[in-house]
């Protein structure tokens, strides 16, 4: 008997690997001979570094970088030595969670730290990059990241523009004279599940600006500045296309990657499933187990568990899912490859208690045990 687990993290509660271990514990209470293969899962957002480092035999790295407010933060990323691949979550260097509510202001927040992480990984020999760009605090069009990599963004006096979206207002010239030479050898797979363009009603500023602290007047200004930046970039880099889907991701970071580096934007779950080679594990499995913290209609619209389920159904494998909470509309998941799903809560409790790491792991193990007794 072979069971493959590929469970997304229960955010704020347990990691993907912890969830897999909990299921293993529950199954082995019934039959210790069952071969349970734990494959970490993520969707390109939070938990991607954790999942890919575990799934690809990587090592975690820590580096102090310039945070979104211009002050130092410690960012964790992963290196897969065998393939010289770095796994980075931009939110670790420029994420919204690093900015207190009272300091949210995209005119000043920068992606400079993201570039510093990339530069550090290049210095350690990496030439492949997997980067999740969700959860940003920024709207600087990625110029901060590019500045850290050696690109010049100059004002009319030939001086570097300041950090943040306000730097775009002063922008007159873009140079690549001092770009680190190894950058041209690098390939970037960017985990991006939004289709917003750089500018306009569905652009970076209009759609995501408010949650980053932008006022209506700021949104109008930043949209205008980003449009000018895109036009200026196109003069030097003809492939620049501000209307391409995903260029508005992470405050224009998607545009920066596509224009200034050798990058492709891809579905986060697609990247994770391919990089962890989950398909090879599923081919001869008897059962596939997936899940996430909350199962609902949004899950059915293409979140990580559905990616797993679709892969499993390619080989006719049964799929069950576990979740911390299950909404009534989660039944739509049954139409997308999940044969049955189960909440793991054992009784009435507070959210705080339910999300405690030890409680969550115990509840998942107990539920997995009972479900396996029925399934075997």
Which positions does each model-derived feature cover?
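N-terminal loops that bind phosphate or other acidic moieties
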Residues: 1-133, 137-376
């Amino acid at each position: 008997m072979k069971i493959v687990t590929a469970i997304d993290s229960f955010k704020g509660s347990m990691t993907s690997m912890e969830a897999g271990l909990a299921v293993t514990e529950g199954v082995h209470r019934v039959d210790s001979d069952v071969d349970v293969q734990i494959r970490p899962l993520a969707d390109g957002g939070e938990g991607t570094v954790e999942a890919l480092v575990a799934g690809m035999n990587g090592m975690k790295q820590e580096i102090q970088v310039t945070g979104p407010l211009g002050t130092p933060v410690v960012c964790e990323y992963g290196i897969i030595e065998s393939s010289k691949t770095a796994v980075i979550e931009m939110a670790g260097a420029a994420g919204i969670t690093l900015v207190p509510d009272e300091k949210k202001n995209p005119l000043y927040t920068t992606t400079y730290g993201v570039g510093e992480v990339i530069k550090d990984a290049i210095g350690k020999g990496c030439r492949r990059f997997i980067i999740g760009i969700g959860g940003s605090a920024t709207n600087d069009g990625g110029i901060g990241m590019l500045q850290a990599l050696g690109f010049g963004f100059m004002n009319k006096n030939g001086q570097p523009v300041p950090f943040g979206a306000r730097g775009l207002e002063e922008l007159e010239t873009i140079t690549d004279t001092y770009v680190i030479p190894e950058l041209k050898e690098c390939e970037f797979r960017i985990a991006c599940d939004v289709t917003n363009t750089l500018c306009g009603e569905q652009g970076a500023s209009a759609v995501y600006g408010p949650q980053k602290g932008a006022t209506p007047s700021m949104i109008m200004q930043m949209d205008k500045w980003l449009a000018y930046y895109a036009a200026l970039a196109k003069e030097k880099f003809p492939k620049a296309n501000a209307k391409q889907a995903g260029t508005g991701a992470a405050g224009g970071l998607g545009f920066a990657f596509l224009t200034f580096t050798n990058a492709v934007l891809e579905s986060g779950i697609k990247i994770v499933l391919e990089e962890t080679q989950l398909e090879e594990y599923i081919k001869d499995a008897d059962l596939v187990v997936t899940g996430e913290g909350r199962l609902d209609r949004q899950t059915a619209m293409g979140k990580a568990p559905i990616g797993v389920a679709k892969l499993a159904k390619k080989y006719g494998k049964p799929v069950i899912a576990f979740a911390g909470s299950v909404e009534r509309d989660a039944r739509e998941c049954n139409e997308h490859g999940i044969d049955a799903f189960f909440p793991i809560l054992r009784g009435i409790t507070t959210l705080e208690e339910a999300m405690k790491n030890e409680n969550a792991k115990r509840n998942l193990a107990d539920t997995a045990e009972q479900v396996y007794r029925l399934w075997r």
